[in-house]
């Protein structure tokens, strides 16, 4: 009780309640700090008596909220009665984060309904702290009430959709803003914030609304947007206006410096024959263009192992990642020797991490002895995450059909990784590999897991 707790820290009030359940205070003429302790007492009779004295102590309202969900009926009803009497709009704004947090527990709906009902009469200015609260549940609650009560203009809703990081708030506000201007007009007030938003959901909503606003021509520049959902919406609007997105994509990809999003867009709506426009771009000076070209070739299912192999050593992580994804279905056609060389380079001077990760992913996809060999090799990698990944692969490894029984390399590799196994599991793995000198198999009475 030496530390002051404010309304803005809902978790602190719950922790206080949990910490003080066993304090032996009796509620008779208590001062405010002592009364707070009594309100958290384990005995329901003491909590009920403390509630009688809590009237007039605004600072203790968070604890009253807590006891609105008390398991003792008398305590619960008295707390709800006090909360009804004490809550006004300012108090409801202050208590909303705690109410929503505690409302996730059983019997928490009462406080949510009460605070929500009071907030419906609040002004937009009183909502401001809730609109920017760090807890997304609070922001969702506040924006939902504001939309239902019509507290925000279409422009304010559009700016909220563009600003908020939560997808639920983005969708809620964008849809409400567009629904409002569909009835009243004034699209410009809504379109500018949405089209300029950082988040793709808001931009996609704005692009889709261009058709209703009679501004179809503006959708063309969003055909090369960095987001796939925005590009899809832009293609729809352009087609509705009589345009041909595919022709535009083809023209842009023939340019000397195409927009990366246009490269992806060509693959999204193009044909396999359009791969001829993408292959030259895998050697483009821009890493983003190279990566998008590789992703487009994968999407069009036009993969050439020989032409893509050099890109596994690209200095840009995004390019190596796309090349790896494209080659994974054909991992069996990728020579494992050069890939292993990228895992065993001398440290600290060796291949970059993203190159080693790409090589390991392809070797892991090969399975069998190749997978085990690669996984044991990266146990000595300087990158901790890659070492952990390798250890997990080793521990899950089992001999596969088609492997040669009794392969001495398997025994040598498992021996290097013996610190990852118990003696029993190591013995079992070696037996599975058919190595000589090990038991013919665990007995049926063995209680160890396989």
List PLM regions with ranges.
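Core helices of alpha-solenoid repeat scaffolds
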Residues: 57-61, 123-124, 154-155, 187-188, ...
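Extended alpha-helical scaffolding segments
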Residues: 49, 60-62, 66-67, 73, ...
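Eukaryotic acidic, Ser/Thr-rich intrinsically disordered low-complexity regions
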Residues: 402-450
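Alpha-solenoid HEAT/Armadillo-like helical repeat scaffolds in large eukaryotic proteins
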Residues: 34-39, 63-71, 94-105, 126-134, ...
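Structural detector for internal amphipathic alpha-helices that build alpha-solenoid repeat scaffolds
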Residues: 10-27, 37, 47-56, 66, ...
